[in-house]
Regions:
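Boundary/entry segment of secreted carbohydrate-active catalytic domains
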Residues: 32-56
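Aromatic-lined substrate-binding rim segments of carbohydrate-active enzymes
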Residues: 59-63, 68-102, 149-164
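Active-site groove signature of glycoside hydrolases
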Residues: 117-144
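Aromatic-lined carbohydrate-recognition surfaces of secreted/lumenal glycan-active proteins
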Residues: 154-175, 211-215, 259-262
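Glycoside hydrolase catalytic-domain groove-lining segments
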Residues: 175-226
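Active-site clefts of carbohydrate-active enzymes
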Residues: 206-240, 260-275
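Aromatic-rich peripheral "rim/lid" segments of glycoside hydrolase catalytic domains that contact
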Residues: 261-311, 316-320
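Hydrophobic alpha-helical transmembrane segments and adjacent short intramembrane/lumenal linkers
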Residues: 414-427, 435-543
């Protein structure tokens, strides 16, 4: 009896042991648990601490509650915030106030930020939560000069305790950035990027010490709720769900750190139509908070959001205006014998065109004034299209951030109000052409008979290269035949060539029909729209020390 009991007991124990060994795998197959991101990487948010200490502490605790283990601060935290981060076990990455700086200005910018660095190091001696210092955000890290500066300041940070690690935040692609080995870690600014994780993996193939410094997309305040509405709060949440979930690909290692941009909307963003916060400026949470909490804590990976109503079809006003101008141009050509004859003379027999202009008979001022209106309208409509396309491109914000505040405010206001851009561009074109025409007519009258009707023909007809810009602008868009980047290239290159052509053709025709000295004609070229516009750009770049090369690299090497 005892032997039988012992055999049964031993058999039962063996079966229980086998069950215990295989139970975890069996239970995982039935109800798989979600991996916690804190096991493999530090996840956090970008944060600007409020000036109120109580508000700052409250927000920091809420970040810890949603599963954040790191915080990237855009300014120096107060002692109370650092102390609370110590107790919460958070890692603090603190940016120095060095933002969108070209290579020649980086050393001076870091020297000005040196007092902030010293205060940060003093704070870090008392608070182990402060582990990293950001030397620069969106500096021109595509040139070796920047790398040398960052390397010297990294050595300076390492030279004295505490042992802070350095990083910089960059929007540039891995193929363009050259300074990864100048700091301890590189953080990528991939806000608005269509494939942020792919951008990080491209970087990861070049260097191991690279994380995500700013992930997210913007919410447009005027957007209707629902996934069908572009840049709605729900679309922001879906973007973060897809981006953060891809970090848990079991076949690849995740980044060492990733920050969602940002905890709360900025008070004064570069573009007021772009709000990146998980909360609005008043502290009200958006649906993206639920996504971040679920993924950061490892409790949820799939989320449902309302689709909302289908967005209303955009206004056709600009399209009707654009093609209306094209139709009006065709109507003028079909109904006006003067226009048809002048077209033939202008393009096939320029000598006869100049003879007719010199004689000044039957110039039809009304038809030429209408042509001037079409040119001005085409420029205005093209400006509206360009502003609307710029408002939808992530790169626009980076370029604007690198401009001096007065210029930034003007351009940002124009991008946010495209109709105003069209009116201003059209008005400027009309005013500048009118000013130039008036000067040409008045000077010509000193030596010969020259009417304003002749001046109108002289200035308007060489402006024909402006007209193709309108259909090109109407055909440009993210899913249109002409991509936004190609349109920008055509607008910039074609616009410069058109300005040179108009200036040269007007001055040559003017010299041929007035017999004025060449020096006088060249002096009158100073009042051309090309010369005045170039002078304005040169003045602004010199006065504000703007690096055109840096702006170009931000526009072309960050997408």
């Amino acid at each position: 009896m005892v032997r039988r009991f012992n055999v049964a007991t031993i058999s039962l124990l063996v079966l229980c042991s086998i069950a215990v060994l295989f139970l975890p795998q069996f239970s995982f197959a039935l109800s798989p648990s979600l991996p916690s991101p804190s096991d493999t990487t530090h996840f956090g948010v970008v944060w600007t601490p409020p000036t109120s200490p109580d508000s700052a502490l409250h927000e920091l605790e809420r970040m810890s509650t949603i599963g954040a283990t790191a915080v990237r601060l855009t300014r120096l935290p107060p002692d109370t915030v650092a102390a609370r981060a110590d107790t919460l076990g958070l890692r603090l990455y603190v940016d120095l106030p060095v933002d969108h700086v070209p290579a020649p200005q980086l050393q001076d910018a870091l020297a000005q930020a040196a007092p902030v660095l010293e205060r940060l190091k003093a704070l870090a001696r008392r608070h182990p939560s402060i582990t990293h210092v950001g030397l620069a955000h969106a500096a021109d890290t595509t040139v070796p000069e920047t790398c040398e500066t960052l390397r010297r300041w990294t050595e300076r940070v390492h030279a004295s305790p505490p042992s802070l690690r350095t990083y910089y935040v960059t929007p540039f692609a891995a193929a363009a950035d050259r300074c990864a080995d100048a700091v301890d870690q590189v953080l990528l600014d991939v806000r608005g990027h269509p494939a942020p994780i792919d951008r990080w993996r491209q970087w990861r193939s070049e260097t191991a010490a690279v994380g995500l410094g700013a992930v997210g997309t913007w919410v447009q305040p005027s957007a209707a709720p629902g996934l069908q509405s572009p840049h709605s709060p729900e679309r922001q949440a879906r973007y973060l769900e897809r981006a953060l979930s891809r970090l848990f690909d079991s076949t690849r290692s995740p980044p060492p750190v990733a920050f969602v941009s940002r905890w709360r909307d900025e008070i004064s963003p570069v573009l007021s139509t772009r709000r990146y916060g998980l909360h609005d400026a008043d502290g009200s949470s958006r649906p993206a908070v639920r996504v971040v909490r679920g993924i950061y804590t490892g409790t949820q990976r799939v989320f449902a959001f309302p689709s909302g109503s289908e967005p209303a079809t955009g206004s056709y006003g600009l399209l009707l205006l654009g093609w209306g101008l094209v139709a009006l141009l065709g109507l003028v050509y079909a109904r006006s014998l003067f226009v048809r004859e002048t077209v033939t003379r202008y393009f096939t027999a320029p000598g006869f065109y100049r003879d007719a202009l010199r004689e000044g008979h039957d110039l039809h001022p009304g038809a030429n004034a209408l042509l001037l209106g079409i040119v001005v309208g085409a420029l205005g409509a093209t400006g509206v299209c360009a502003a609307r396309l710029a408002a939808a491109q992530p790169v626009t914000e980076r370029v604007l951030a690198a401009l001096p505040p007065p210029v930034q405010v003007v351009l940002a206001g124009g991008i946010e109000h495209p109709i105003t851009v069209g009116v201003v561009i059209g008005g400027l074109a009309l005013g500048l052409l009118g000013l130039w025409m008036g000067a040409l007519v008045l000077v010509a009258r000193w030596g010969t008979r020259f009417s304003f009707a002749q001046g109108l023909v002289l200035v308007v007809w060489p402006c024909w290269p402006v007209l193709p810009a309108l259909p090109v602008a109407l055909a440009a868009g993210p899913e249109a035949p002409i991509s936004p980047s190609l349109f920008a290239l055509l607008l910039l290159g074609g616009g410069l060539l058109a300005c040179f052509y108009v200036t040269a053709r007007v001055l040559y025709d003017y010299w041929a029909i007035t017999d004025l000295p060449g020096s006088t004609v060249l002096l009158l070229g100073v009042l051309s729209p090309l010369a005045l516009g170039s002078a304005l750009v040169l003045f602004l770049t010199t006065w504000y020390d703007v690096s055109a090369a840096f702006l170009w690299r931000l526009a072309t090497l960050t997408s």
